[in-house]
Amino acid sequence: MNVKGLTPKDLEQYGIHDISEVIYNPSYDLLFEEETKPGLTGYEKGTLTSLGAIAVDTGIFTGRSPKDKYIVRDDVTRDTVWWADQGKGKNDNKPLSPQVWADLKSLVTEQLSGKRLFVVDAFCGANADTRLKVRFITEVAWQAHFVKNMFIRPTQEELENFTPDFIVMNGAKCTNPNWKAQGLNSENFVAFNLTERIQLIGGTWYGGEMKKGMFSMMNYFLPLKGIASMHCSANVGESGDVAIFFGLSGTGKTTLSTDPKRKLIGDDEHGWDDDGVFNFEGGCYAKTIHLSKEAEPDIYGAIKRDALLENVVVLADGSVDFDDGSKTENTRVSYPIYHIDNIVKPVSKAGHAKKVIFLTADAFGVLPPVARLTPEQTQYHFLSGFTAKLAGTERGVTEPTPTFSACFGAAFLSLHPTQYAQVLVKRMQACGAQAYLVNTGWNGTGKRISIKDTRAIIDAILNGDIDKAETQTLPVFNLAIPTALPGVNSEILDPRDTYADKAQWDVKADDLADRFVKNFDKYTDTPVGQALTKVGPKR
């Protein structure tokens, strides 16, 4: 299966030698054979399920390993990367010396040497002008399958002239014995070198490290060119109107952007340039815990031949128990985006977004179901990236847990968060886009805002009804909230009205305002952040 132009000798430039065979851009049928062939053991082995998809296990790493993420600090990155050891904000961009990088690289290249290797060339980014051409090198068939699903698959013609911009070498089977002496976190590593344009993976089998690794790189390169790089879902209406949905896990990002009246551009990673909004990916990576055909027919229907399940429980008859989270609650499936019917074709991109929606699930019962944001408030709430979860009852704790994640994706930011906020607002202002804060969480009744009301709110945003509505100002947070919207229970629009005693809201609002102010302090080390404090909550 050696395709013209790629031989074992071509991989020697990366330090990999004595390769017995290169399996280049394998077909799905060949990957199926390789994943299920007799003799495979451990985490290399794929299991055929009754749905037609292959299931694999990723071992102890059932999610990303943020404590093992490093970026080489050199002349290219020293003054651009948002470093973990600088400033007030916490992030995962730990610096790595060029010397330690060389050691890690030699571990991975030795691991891959002397083997049959799978090489997948793919694009990250649907826009030809700004996409990254990525070459993935691995000895494990299902890892090649994962990136074939998740990244954009080139045509045969595009492959003939494919010169990679970035190399990902996945040495999941190797670990670093010298990590303590090198001052690293553990024997596992996910390391990036922006001068060499290489990502190295060692010790972790989790497929998402390759997906989110390239997202972190797009988050480095694009904003420096004035292009927004966003952790969001996006869809488009029949008239070409584009909406983007930001939100942390559990806020309804996937649910609310999956709309039978609108076509999906993508579910997780997007850019926004002079032409409009475009998907970075060629697939979806959906959570499957408690998945049912009735509740999420699109995702369930996508789990068929060529889909790849991770860490699910497969029963003796080949059926999948999606309710069993004994391996992890973070069970996943990757599949090519065309497994979903209602998508933008043939390329996952559309025009400029006119509606930008920040989803939050406020468990404190303070924020309104919807508010219209000013450009300054847009930056403030984008940088705050707030959501909150109800505490687990098993520990008997009733206090909600707040989460603040810059730009609704702090784990993947390579530059300072204010750079993403500035680029987003510039893009919005250039095309007259409007931002809204939508709370899918709880209010004074103690119940979660109904999905019916939330969907009606999203409809009012998308069809423009909200922009015609009368508004009032919610105190403390100074948010413009509508007094009435079609199809929405008017009694919930002002969160104070959901409390039997409005003084209760006042107390909770002051408490949450303090948390916002305290969190935002980390951005006051830049002039942009300092200026935005004036639009934050005021007690």
Swiss-Prot record:
Gene3D superfamilies: 3.90.228.20, Phosphoenolpyruvate Carboxykinase, domain 1, Phosphoenolpyruvate Carboxykinase, domain 2. Signal peptide: none annotated. Its EC number is 4.1.1.49. Substrate binds at R64, Y206, K212, R332. Its cofactor is Mn(2+). GO terms for biological process: gluconeogenesis. It catalyses: oxaloacetate + ATP = phosphoenolpyruvate + ADP + CO2. ATP binds at residues 212, 231, 247-255, 296, 332, 448-449, 454. GO terms for cellular component: cytosol. Keywords: ATP-binding, Cytoplasm, Decarboxylase, Gluconeogenesis, Lyase, Manganese, Metal-binding, Nucleotide-binding. Binds 1 Mn(2+) ion per subunit. InterPro entries: PEP_carboxykinase_ATP (IPR001272), PEP_carboxykinase_C (IPR013035), PEP_carboxykinase_N (IPR008210), PEPCK_ATP_CS (IPR015994). It comes from the Bacteria. Pathway: Carbohydrate biosynthesis; gluconeogenesis. CDD domains: PEPCK_ATP. Mn(2+) binds at K212, H231, D268. It is found in: Cytoplasm. One of its GO terms (molecular function) is phosphoenolpyruvate carboxykinase (ATP) activity. It is an enzyme of class 4 (lyase). Belongs to the phosphoenolpyruvate carboxykinase (ATP) family. Involved in the gluconeogenesis. Catalyzes the conversion of oxaloacetate (OAA) to phosphoenolpyruvate (PEP) through direct phosphoryl transfer between the nucleoside triphosphate and OAA. Monomer. This is Phosphoenolpyruvate carboxykinase (ATP). It comes from Proteus mirabilis (strain HI4320). The gene is pckA.
